[in-house]
């Protein structure tokens, strides 16, 4: 009986515990999505949110960008996207097998198939031979629209030409379709356009964006002002102003000579200490004594005329004092009278001169008359002045210099002097086109203004060349030279531009060469040695080369670059 009562008590306790279960171990119901049983209670599972009674929706954090949430933090991406949150573009063109037969171009969230010329794109992405497209002979392929063949252009900046086959460029700058930001100008390109900073501005990243910033040409040394001028930076450019004492446009400043005009009339200078009088209002200046000697210094030879004007004879009285006392001389007829003081006689070197009339001594004062006029013919040319000996100073004729001055010294005295310059706007300036060359240098019009030289197109197969020669003549003894020129070698298979020098007989190896690039460039080459007879530009082209070789602004200066 006691055992039975214990069993009943234990079973009642078990039932009470089961009734108080809080649902900590939920069990998902198989027949429902996102529903779980928490003991005797049914609710949404973890990672699901209740939308309506009996329906639960999964929760994804972060949300799916290009897809839908199918489970807790589980996204199903739309076609063309990938990634955990479907935020990445899927490159279908890189999949295997490739989705396109000929050409594939990936786009955001999708892709496009293109066919080669002569083929037509089918709806399934494959390409099929289209006789109509081949007959259309489109420049960039074709498309069939409503049973009609239509040529296509690959860029929105291109449009079909009137012939319906080729594509021509749309000048967005001229039509006004686009507007560039401040301080930029629109530059049209084939199929598009660019906004380029104006001249004097540079594109810089400022304040989180790209802006055209003014270039300080003065501080960067990118100006053409003369060395005797000041450079002032202005917005988008600069200006030059000659310094005090110089005049010009700022690019070329010439020294203004200072002319000092003296009063008319000769200047009388006494041999010893005295005063110098200029005209009626002269200023008295004392001539200092020469050292400790009592005798006047020997006057050096000078070109002005020296006039000896004797004074009256002073009488000498027989007194114990050996020094005679001369009488003051009468005033000369000149408007200004120099004061002269006769020297007392000494035992070592008396200043009196005996005369044939009487044994009395007399003193003679020499008055120096200086002419302040400029002498037309110098007595002797200076040794550091270079004098052309020819009647005409032609550039390529004989140019002699003063004897005793070598070419090296001439370069040191005047380095960087321009001896030749040519921009080919008015001819070849002494350059010679070799007639035996296969090709020839021809002048071409520069869109920016002026002319430049270019190599003609090759018409025969094989290597062809055009040579342009400048003979230096006697300038080859000028020492080192600096050759400066602008050039361009642009386009597909443009050819080669080279520089040679001829010293003895034929020219040697090329000093410089270029076979490609983009746009105009500036180059300087130092021609070493004093035996360079000629400078040669050689442009090579082959048949079928569509590029261009250009040459402009050639100059030669003394000294190294």
UniProtKB/Swiss-Prot annotation:
<comment type="function">
    <text>Functional ligand of integrin alpha-8/beta-1 in kidney development. Regulates the expression of GDNF with integrin alpha-8/beta-1 which is essential for kidney development. May also play a role in the development and function of various tissues, regulating cell adhesion, spreading and survival through the binding of several integrins.</text>
</comment>
<feature type="disulfide bond">
    <location>
        <begin position="93"/>
        <end position="104"/>
    </location>
</feature>
<keyword id="KW-0732">Signal</keyword>
<dbReference type="GO" id="GO:0030485">
    <property type="term" value="C:smooth muscle contractile fiber"/>
</dbReference>
<dbReference type="GO" id="GO:0097195">
    <property type="term" value="P:pilomotor reflex"/>
</dbReference>
<dbReference type="GO" id="GO:0033631">
    <property type="term" value="P:cell-cell adhesion mediated by integrin"/>
</dbReference>
<dbReference type="GO" id="GO:0070374">
    <property type="term" value="P:positive regulation of ERK1 and ERK2 cascade"/>
</dbReference>
<dbReference type="GO" id="GO:0045669">
    <property type="term" value="P:positive regulation of osteoblast differentiation"/>
</dbReference>
<feature type="compositionally biased region" description="Low complexity">
    <location>
        <begin position="352"/>
        <end position="366"/>
    </location>
</feature>
<dbReference type="GO" id="GO:0071356">
    <property type="term" value="P:cellular response to tumor necrosis factor"/>
</dbReference>
<feature type="disulfide bond">
    <location>
        <begin position="173"/>
        <end position="186"/>
    </location>
</feature>
<keyword id="KW-0130">Cell adhesion</keyword>
<dbReference type="GO" id="GO:0001658">
    <property type="term" value="P:branching involved in ureteric bud morphogenesis"/>
</dbReference>
<feature type="disulfide bond">
    <location>
        <begin position="218"/>
        <end position="231"/>
    </location>
</feature>
<dbReference type="GO" id="GO:0005604">
    <property type="term" value="C:basement membrane"/>
</dbReference>
<dbReference type="InterPro" id="IPR009030">
    <property type="entry name" value="Growth_fac_rcpt_cys_sf"/>
</dbReference>
<feature type="disulfide bond">
    <location>
        <begin position="115"/>
        <end position="127"/>
    </location>
</feature>
<dbReference type="GO" id="GO:0016020">
    <property type="term" value="C:membrane"/>
</dbReference>
<dbReference type="Pfam" id="PF07645">
    <property type="entry name" value="EGF_CA"/>
</dbReference>
<dbReference type="GO" id="GO:0051145">
    <property type="term" value="P:smooth muscle cell differentiation"/>
</dbReference>
<dbReference type="GO" id="GO:0010811">
    <property type="term" value="P:positive regulation of cell-substrate adhesion"/>
</dbReference>
<keyword id="KW-0106">Calcium</keyword>
<dbReference type="GO" id="GO:0045184">
    <property type="term" value="P:establishment of protein localization"/>
</dbReference>
<feature type="short sequence motif" description="Integrin interaction">
    <location>
        <begin position="382"/>
        <end position="384"/>
    </location>
</feature>
<keyword id="KW-0221">Differentiation</keyword>
<dbReference type="GO" id="GO:0030198">
    <property type="term" value="P:extracellular matrix organization"/>
</dbReference>
<dbReference type="InterPro" id="IPR013320">
    <property type="entry name" value="ConA-like_dom_sf"/>
</dbReference>
<feature type="compositionally biased region" description="Low complexity">
    <location>
        <begin position="307"/>
        <end position="316"/>
    </location>
</feature>
<dbReference type="InterPro" id="IPR000152">
    <property type="entry name" value="EGF-type_Asp/Asn_hydroxyl_site"/>
</dbReference>
<feature type="disulfide bond">
    <location>
        <begin position="242"/>
        <end position="253"/>
    </location>
</feature>
<dbReference type="InterPro" id="IPR052235">
    <property type="entry name" value="Nephronectin_domain"/>
</dbReference>
<dbReference type="GO" id="GO:0045987">
    <property type="term" value="P:positive regulation of smooth muscle contraction"/>
</dbReference>
<feature type="domain" description="MAM">
    <location>
        <begin position="420"/>
        <end position="561"/>
    </location>
</feature>
<dbReference type="GO" id="GO:0030511">
    <property type="term" value="P:positive regulation of transforming growth factor beta receptor signaling pathway"/>
</dbReference>
<keyword id="KW-0217">Developmental protein</keyword>
<feature type="disulfide bond">
    <location>
        <begin position="197"/>
        <end position="212"/>
    </location>
</feature>
<dbReference type="GO" id="GO:0045944">
    <property type="term" value="P:positive regulation of transcription by RNA polymerase II"/>
</dbReference>
<dbReference type="GO" id="GO:0001657">
    <property type="term" value="P:ureteric bud development"/>
</dbReference>
<dbReference type="GO" id="GO:0005509">
    <property type="term" value="F:calcium ion binding"/>
</dbReference>
<dbReference type="InterPro" id="IPR000998">
    <property type="entry name" value="MAM_dom"/>
</dbReference>
<feature type="disulfide bond">
    <location>
        <begin position="180"/>
        <end position="195"/>
    </location>
</feature>
<dbReference type="GO" id="GO:0005576">
    <property type="term" value="C:extracellular region"/>
</dbReference>
């Amino acid at each position: 009986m006691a055992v039975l009562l214990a069993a009943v008590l234990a079973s009642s306790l078990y039932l009470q515990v089961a009734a108080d279960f809080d649902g900590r171990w939920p069990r998902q119901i198989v027949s429902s999505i996102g529903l779980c049983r928490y003991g005797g209670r049914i609710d949404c599972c973890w990672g699901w949110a209740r939308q309506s009674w009996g329906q639960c929706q999964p929760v994804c954090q972060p949300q799916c960008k290009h897809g839908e949430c199918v489970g807790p933090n589980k996204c199903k991406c739309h076609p063309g996207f990938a990634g955990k949150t479907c935020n990445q573009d899927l490159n279908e063109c890189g999949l295997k097998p490739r989705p396109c037969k000929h050409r594939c171009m990936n786009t955001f969230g999708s892709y496009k198939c293109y066919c080669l010329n002569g083929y037509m794109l089918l709806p399934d992405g494959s390409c099929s031979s289209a006789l109509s497209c081949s007959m259309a002979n489109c420049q960039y392929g074709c498309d069939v629209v409503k049973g009609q063949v239509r040529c296509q252009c690959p860029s929105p900046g291109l449009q079909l030409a009137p012939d319906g086959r080729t594509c021509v460029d749309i000048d967005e700058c001229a039509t006004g379709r686009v507007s560039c930001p401040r301080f930029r100008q629109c530059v049209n390109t084939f199929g598009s356009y660019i906004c380029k900073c104006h001249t004097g501005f540079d594109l810089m990243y400022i304040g989180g964006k790209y802006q055209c910033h003014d270039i300080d040409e003065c501080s960067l040394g990118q100006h053409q002002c003369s060395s005797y001028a000041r450079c002032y930076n202005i917005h988008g450019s600069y200006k030059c102003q000659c310094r005090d004492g110089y005049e010009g446009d700022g690019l070329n400043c010439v020294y203004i000579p200072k002319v000092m005009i003296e009063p008319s009339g000769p200047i009388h200078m006494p041999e010893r200490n005295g005063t110098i009088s200029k005209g009626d209002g002269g200023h008295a200046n004392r001539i200092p004594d020469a050292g400790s000697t009592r005798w006047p210094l020997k006057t050096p030879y000078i070109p002005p005329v020296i006039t000896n004007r004797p004074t009256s004879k002073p009488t000498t009285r027989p007194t114990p004092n050996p020094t005679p006392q001369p009488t003051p001389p009468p005033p000369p007829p000149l408007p200004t009278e120099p004061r002269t003081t006769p020297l007392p006689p000494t035992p070592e070197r008396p200043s009196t001169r005996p005369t044939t009339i009487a044994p009395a001594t007399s003193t003679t004062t020499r008055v120096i008359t200086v002419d302040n006029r400029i002498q037309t013919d110098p007595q002797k040319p200076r040794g550091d002045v270079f004098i052309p000996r020819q009647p005409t100073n032609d550039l390529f004729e004989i140019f002699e210099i003063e004897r005793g001055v070598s070419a090296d010294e001439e370069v040191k005295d005047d380095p960087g002097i321009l001896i030749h310059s040519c921009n080919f706007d008015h001819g070849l300036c002494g350059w010679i086109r070799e007639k035996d060359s296969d090709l020839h240098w021809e002048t071409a019009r520069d869109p920016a203004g002026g002319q430049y030289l270019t190599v003609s197109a090759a018409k025969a197969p094989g290597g062809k060349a055009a040579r342009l020669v400048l003979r230096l003549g006697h300038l080859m003894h000028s020492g080192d030279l600096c050759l400066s020129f602008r050039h361009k070698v642009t386009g597909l298979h443009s050819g080669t531009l080279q520089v040679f020098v001829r010293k003895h007989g034929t020219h040697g190896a090329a000093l410089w060469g270029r076979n490609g690039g983009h746009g105009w460039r500036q180059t300087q080459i130092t021609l070493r040695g004093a035996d360079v007879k000629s400078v040669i530009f050689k442009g090579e082209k082959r048949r079928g080369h569509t590029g261009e070789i250009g040459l402009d602004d050639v100059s030669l200066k003394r000294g190294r670059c």
